[in-house]
Amino acid sequence: MSADRVRLPDLIDRLPADERDITTRLATAFLDAGHELFLVGGIVRDLLLDRGRTDLDFTTSAVPEETKAASVAARPDSVYLVGEEYGTVGLVFRVDPEALPITVEVTTFRSEVYPTEDRRPVVTHGVSLVDDLSRRDFTINALALDPLAGELVDPFNGITDLAHRRIVAVGDAGERFNEDPLRVLRAARFASQLGFDIDPDTLDAMRETGPQLARISRERIAAELNRLLVGDR
């Protein structure tokens, strides 16, 4: 096991039973088809913090057509393409007829390059899991869980930052915020929602990037501010 993988075999048990069953079915189906599949992002962060339910998001080595084919064995009720450019496939599971269906998203490993300031990245599929995690905003969101092996993949020390209750940008903070200035508000939102502090270098980059929020649409800013205002501090 590499240094950035940690054995946490019981972490998946924190999922509600229906979501745990879906996760196991999907992971088994993808493994049988020869693909990697990981829970990724906010769901992993919130499982580690033992917080409430977060949407199930997966990342995979499979491209969308392979994802749709592999998912058949997991018996979803419907499959749809969320965004072809980003390699995302949505799966709907109607587990309980008395409850809302459970919708999950499965996205192909990808890297992103932002050649201009219009926020439209050039997306490359077929990269590694670590490459995929490296494009994410903060270390606490750059975490992936192998549901079957019970291994947490943590190449950017997100577990340490969770333990120290701090928001730290992945890699170069200035680059992360320049890629998408809305991340300035996202950092503030996570600090508010989780009661975390913001790492000094990350905070400096936020101050430098703040004026660039002027190029973000009012709708996106308003949506992020609404999420920020419901935080605890």
Each model region followed by its residue ranges:
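Catalytic cores of the polymerase beta-like nucleotidyltransferase superfamily
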Residues: 1-233
